Curated annotation (Swiss-Prot):
It is an enzyme of class 4 (lyase). It is found in: Cytoplasm. This is Coproporphyrin III ferrochelatase. Pathway: Porphyrin-containing compound metabolism; protoheme biosynthesis.
Amino acid sequence: MSKKVMGLLVMAYGTPYKEEDLERYYTHIRHGRKPSEEMLADLRERYEAIGGISPLAAITKQQAEKLAERLNEVQDEIEFRMYLGLKHIEPFVEDAVQQMHEDGIEEAVSIVLAPHFSTFSVKSYNGRAKEEAARLGGPKLTCVESWYTEPKFIQYWADRVKETYASMSEREREKAVLIVSAHSLPEKIIAMGDPYPKQLQETADFIAKEAGVSEYVIGWQSAGNTPEPWLGPDVQDLTRQLYEEKGYEAFVYVPAGFVSDHLEVLYDNDIECKQVTDELGVSYYRPPMPNAHPQFIDALATVVLNHLRKEGESL
């Protein structure tokens, strides 16, 4: 019996592939407004500080390929064909949907490489994909909305946190705090009833419980440079505040809203947060990001299959 063929649309933010892409990439993020020379110079400096253009593009591609491989390995009913769609650079989400349509894919499942739902992120990715599919007359698309509660995802982070705490001296362990963070979004999402902040808190609760950590908080990072208020506290301010109020001597940063090594982690955490801990004379720890770790890829595969089972697929 031949297997059913299904498109696997993996969506992510996207990143410049080379330095020449910086301007058009950030122009797209800024809805067509070109970044100033100062902004571009600042961005170049940040990328240089992390060793050149972020590794995100290669990691995202690897995550998507490994996910398709894993899905085809663990079940025999469906043959998944992977299509990668990015938010701010080619292949855009629409390009991927168009490619599926041209390849004769009639049904597809989408997943965004971001664990939490928000109107600004996951909703906009899935909205763009559905809109393009409707415009073309196919494929029929079912979308994963969030996956932060997946036990295997929580286990990935809990295992890394346990390893990190095990590497500390006893004194550090007793005086350590875990900061679980995600990308800040404009504060107005709270008034809109967006579940994003609550989902980050739940993620932190799950990870801390599984890792056996009692001292933990959530923080926000990488806020945009706009006049409107963004979700806080920012992780750098939070680090100073926790040090002053509680006297912690070791800070463990888990940027659980992200899934790979990229500018927001390699610069905003590993450089900016570390500058703060160095200034305070305390220890900085940041467990490895999921990237294409088999444990994380298996978590994503489980999310996709569980979603399809709920949609009535016989798997």
